[in-house]
């Protein structure tokens, strides 16, 4: 068993659906977790597929909620966005960008390959100070309510196994292989250093 709590980050594009669903579930299980996005702005489904509603990362979830409520309560209730923003507001005030975080983590989960690439690139561009390893793991999770929940439970299962592990370094590869077989998904994994 690890001597200190596992420090986990979950990262998606906008820090609204996938990373926040995992944040919610991991937090309920008592894990030390933070969540982030990587894009320059938060993009939510708009009135048409090619017209997203765009917010700055400094916009709180409550401000987004109230704005969408005012714009089209029925649409954003029907597509689940108001529910998601309400959940998010109960977890933290607003979205955060990974590139602006200076905290260290043991494991960072990303929800799509482009986010994985951004996180790894960002970590590799930072000046190494402590040489503490961080495992970056990508599992592709579609940006839907159902897939976000399924992905969050898989992330939670991996975290719980790692929390019980004596040595992350020795056990992670084998654990990921078992989870790939169980979930029918393949994961990307690399180690970076702080």
From Swiss-Prot:
Main subcellular location of this protein, as a coarse class: nucleus
Give an example GO biological process: termination of RNA polymerase II transcription
Q: Where is the signal peptide?
A: none
Q: Does the keyword Transferase apply?
A: no
Could you say which EC number(s) this protein's record lists? Answer: 3.1.3.16
Which Gene Ontology terms cover its molecular function?
A: RNA polymerase II CTD heptapeptide repeat phosphatase activity
Q: What does this protein do?
A: Protein phosphatase that catalyzes the dephosphorylation of the C-terminal domain of RNA polymerase II. Plays a role in RNA processing and termination.
Q: What's this protein's name?
A: RNA polymerase II subunit A C-terminal domain phosphatase SSU72 like protein 3
Q: Which gene encodes it?
A: SSU72L3
């Amino acid at each position: 068993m690890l001597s200190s709590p596992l420090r986990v980050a979950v990262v998606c594009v906008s820090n609204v659906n996938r990373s926040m669903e995992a944040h919610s579930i991991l937090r309920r299980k008592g894990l030390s977790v933070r969540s982030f996005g990587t894009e320059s702005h938060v993009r939510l489904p708009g009135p048409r597929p090619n017209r997203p509603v765009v917010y700055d990362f400094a916009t709180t979830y409550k401000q987004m909620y109230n704005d969408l409520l005012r714009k089209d309560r029925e649409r954003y209730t029907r597509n689940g966005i108001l529910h998601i923003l309400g959940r998010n507001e109960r977890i933290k005030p607003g979205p955060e960008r990974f590139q602006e975080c200076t905290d260290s983590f043991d494991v960072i989960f990303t929800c799509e390959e482009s986010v994985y690439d951004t996180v790894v690139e960002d970590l590799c561009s930072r000046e190494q100070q402590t040489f503490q390893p961080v495992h970056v793991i990508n599992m592709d999770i579609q940006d839907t309510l159902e897939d976000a929940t399924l992905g969050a439970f898989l992330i939670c299962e991996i975290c719980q196994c790692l929390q019980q592990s004596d040595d992350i370094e020795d056990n992670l590869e084998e654990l990921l292989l078992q989870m790939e077989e169980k979930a029918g998904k393949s994961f990307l994994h690399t180690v970076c250093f702080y």
